[in-house]
């Protein structure tokens, strides 16, 4: 999959840049869309690594605003997960999946 050609991913990245600016260390698409085995109605799973995050709930609220705006305009379902910068280097099954299948936005 060419993630640059997906307008939803472009919109997600632009919204992250507008909301967080340089605070985003990485934004990683994972799940079925990253593996290129998604159905047309599959959601977009995005891990957002933040250099200086507020609480998990505050960041989840900010990301929910982005998710809702895009859902309202396009019908695309986005599940964005806020994570502290550097967590992608931690050993866990989830981080192994991100390393194996993830696509940086």
Question: For each of these PLM feature ranges, what is it?
Answer:
Residues 1-26, 34-40, 51-105:
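Catalytic core of pol beta-like nucleotidyltransferases
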Residues 44-49:
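Short beta-strand->loop micro-motif that forms the acidic, two-metal-ion catalytic signature
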